[in-house]
């Protein structure tokens, strides 16, 4: 869907790769998935170079050209100050306010995925907490645990502003009606993800923030907790991860921040 099916070797330039990376980020692809895509392209371009299909000057990878990000190279998480800027952002349009609030709800609701967000129902709320199981893991063989999220005042305000009337079987937000096929549900989820990302991209540009997407909300939730001193085990459970390694990958940018801060301490003499 990025540039069609027929792509020539000559069209794969540094700029093309950067545009493709941005496209994948907007599609909510993880850093590891993006790395897989680009290593595959690089392998194809390496073979094309060996076969004489492209010249060395046309090869888009390497120092001074496009470099594939390592797993911890991209800073995905925002700071609390940036989140505050987003929460206060207002361009006067209802659409921006709605999608901004949806993004904030994703962040506040343990970095919930859009696929799980659209399926939340009022019956999932018990004693001031939302209970849900991640769609990504609900069909695995491992025993499933509910993710529980305290409903904070900002979350409640978002529900009151944009939610459906409160009935036990009703979806909290007016995205699904419960009559969709699995494919229709997938398409509605994808449409909502793109709509949120489009608005958040505009907000990011206006606020001078590098990149904001639904995926950023999840990374930010994890990193803010880590910065506050929460244990990796707690963060892993809050995210619904099956193992700590996955959580550690999420927190890679935080570890980089810590190394930079500690390195700076060493120079204070």
Kindly label every feature range from the protein language model:
Residues 77, 134-139, 239-264:
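Catalytic-site neighborhood detector that most strongly recognizes the C-terminal catalytic loop/helix
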Residues 88, 93, 194-237:
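Short, basic (Lys/Arg/His-rich) helix/loop patches that form interaction surfaces
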Residues 11, 63-64, 119-161:
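Conserved tyrosine-mediated DNA breakage-rejoining catalytic core shared by Y-recombinases
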Residues 83, 152-209:
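Active-site/catalytic core of tyrosine-dependent DNA strand-transfer enzymes
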